[in-house]
Amino acid sequence: MATPTESELASPIPQTNPGSYEELHRKARDVFPTCFEGAKLMVNKGLSSHFQVSHTLSLSAMNTGYRFGATYVGTNQVGPAEAYPILLGDTDVNGNTTATILHQLGIYRTKLQGQIQQGKLAGAQATIERKGRLSTLGLTLANIDLVNEAGILVGQFLRRLTPRLDVGTEMVYQYGKNIPGGQISVLSYAARYTANHFIAAATLGASGVHLTYYHKQNENLAFGVEFECNANVGEAVTTLAYQTELPEEGVTMRASFDTNWTVGGVFEKRLSQQLPFTLALSGTLNHVKAAGKFGIGLIIG
């Protein structure tokens, strides 16, 4: 089997396996800004080539506190920039903790997630995926409660039909005493088309419609469009976003605008070519509600 070149790895056309169902809309979503409020200081420190820790201090009206995070990446190299196992975790001073474990054995990839809030298990989720030559089959179990007989099961299937077209389906099954009738299931269908400079993806189900479009204008400029329609509440929102980079200046800008008249953006500027200091400015404004939020952050490492 020939080793893929760097250009092939960087190509927007996926390799033989179509990837995970959860990643159908990821390319477009990566363009959107992740806005924050207040002041934030983040320090990332690599202790070795496999282990990294982070310290985050946040000051805002909604969230003030300190969080410690750690990341471990194993030595099982399965791709040019992919190694397993991966362990992620972070916690605050009150003991509220989230943790994730990812591992891959052959064509099987597993993911375990857990969350503890106020000393109690707030959520748990386990996922296993089988990645074949032309398809990915996934099964997720979430918040399974054997005592109260409640939980969520999700089955996903994504298939490569042509080098550019992927189709898939998802079945979500939830059961429990709080569910009308004791159980409910939702079936969704999905498709993704990948061209040289754009990716279009769609998810259609009884609960609504989700459409995304990603366009790579050039090496440093990309656009994203997202349409979400929730049939249960009768709401629909369209969002336009862009991402631009100036590598020579160390500048990255992401901004978005939606049909709820909300504008948001995050500006990042590398302060030094020799030192790993990055300044981040964030802002959101809703013109209808006349409400705005502003954030400033410093990232070290």
From Swiss-Prot:
Residue segments, region Disordered: 1-20
GO BP annotation list: monoatomic ion transport; protein import into mitochondrial matrix; protein targeting to mitochondrion
Biased composition range(s): Polar residues: 1-19
GO cellular component: mitochondrial membrane; mitochondrial outer membrane translocase complex; pore complex
Tissue: Ubiquitously expressed, but highly expressed in the pharyngeal muscles, the nerve ring, the intestine, gonadal sheath and in the tail hypodermis.
Disulfide bonds: none
Disruption phenotype: Mutants arrest during the larval developmental stage. Impaired mitochondrial homeostasis with the up-regulation of the mitochondrial unfolded protein chaperone hsp-6. RNAi-mediated knockdown results in embryonic lethality or larval lethality between the L1 and L3 stage of larval development. Surviving progeny are growth retarded. No localization of the mitochondrial targeted protein nnt-1 to the mitochondria of intestinal cells.
Domain of life: Eukaryota
GO MF terms, alphabetically ordered: porin activity; protein transmembrane transporter activity
Alphabetized UniProt keyword annotations: Ion transport, Membrane, Mitochondrion, Mitochondrion outer membrane, Porin, Protein transport, Transmembrane, Transmembrane beta strand, Transport
Stored Pfam families: Porin_3
Subunit description: Forms part of the preprotein translocase complex of the outer mitochondrial membrane (TOM complex). Interacts with mitochondrial targeting sequences.
Protein name as annotated: Mitochondrial import receptor subunit TOM40 homolog
Chain's gene name: tomm-40
